[in-house]
A protein has these predicted regions:
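Extended amphipathic alpha-helical scaffolds
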Residues: 1-5, 37, 45, 49, ...
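Internal alpha/beta scaffold segment
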Residues: 1-48, 52
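Catalytic cores of large soluble enzymes that bind and process phosphate-bearing ligands
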Residues: 2-10, 24-26, 37, 56, ...
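Exposed alpha-helical structural elements
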Residues: 10-13, 63, 159, 214
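Dual-mode signal for accessory low-complexity, basic/Gly-rich regions
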Residues: 51, 67-246
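Residue-level signal for secondary-structure boundary elements
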Residues: 22-30, 56-60, 168-172, 227-228
Length: 246
């Protein structure tokens, strides 16, 4: 409804974001802790979901080939497909081929639990079909070295910044790509430096490089602040030992 739209709050948020980005500085190249804002965090998870597509695996263009049932990532990485959550963006009873969906783990404590196998590829590979892709991927909350009680947790971006103490907060990606065969990536970023959990100044014109397996094995935090309107329920996330170059 038009009456439910708070245009003034939206414009105020956009203005604040623009003002905070005035006067960016370059940081020295090096290894930093990296926090990724929930508005762009799915950029780093999308290549993982793509690599779990059986079409890529059958064509041998996936860096997660021959990974089903194996522990590839750390205990802190659990990705669920919450396809049957009523009334939520992305939820559905069937995929476009008519295969029934279900709530299920895609990655459970670092173990690959599912490939996405459509009916055509299932016949080519001689395996049972699943759903063709994730309906509503949800990254579960995590903080390295801390026990988070189910149903009693709230981990915001502010909490993650305080947990990481010092590093770079990424709020946008400026181009770049990842290699689907090797998992190597290079992305341009923009965002803010932070110290003692507080944002200090904007940064631009930096690159992050590495390998997606290594990156996700350096996961140290995942929040509970995924955007409700998004099909990809990916919260703010944090990694350690990320290579930045100016």
């Amino acid at each position: 409804k038009e009456a439910d739209l708070d245009c003034s709050a939206c414009s105020a948020k956009a203005l604040d974001k623009a003002v905070r980005q005035i006067g960016p500085k370059k940081r020295k190249s090096g290894s930093y802790r990296m926090v990724v804002d929930n508005s762009v965090a799915s950029r780093l998870l999308a290549p993982i979901a793509s690599a779990l597509n059986a079409s890529s695996i059958q064509q041998k263009v996936s860096f997660l080939e021959d990974s089903l049932g194996k522990k590839i990532f750390p205990d802190g990485l659990t990705l669920m497909d919450m396809a049957r959550t009523p009334g939520k963006s992305g939820s559905r009873l069937f995929d476009t081929e008519g295969v029934a969906t279900k709530d299920c783990p895609i990655i459970d404590r670092g173990v690959i639990k599912q490939y996405f196998v459509n009916t055509y590829i299932s016949r080519k590979m001689g395996i049972e079909p699943t759903v063709e892709d994730a309906s509503r991927p949800c990254l579960m909350p995590y903080m390295k070295g801390k026990e988070l009680a189910d149903g009693e947790i709230s981990v915001s971006l502010k909490d993650i910044l305080q947990f990481c103490r010092n590093g770079i907060l990424v709020t946008g990606f400026n181009g770049g790509n990842s290699n689907p065969v090797t998992g190597d990536f290079s992305f341009g970023i923009e965002g803010f430096a932070f110290r003692n959990g507080k944002i200090t100044h904007p940064v631009r014109e930096m690159l992050i490089t590495g390998n997606l397996k290594d990156l996700w094995n350096n996961l140290i935090a995942a929040g509970t602040d995924a955007r409700p309107s998004s099909r990809w329920q990916i919260p703010s996330i944090a990694f350690e030992n990320v290579s930045f170059s100016a």
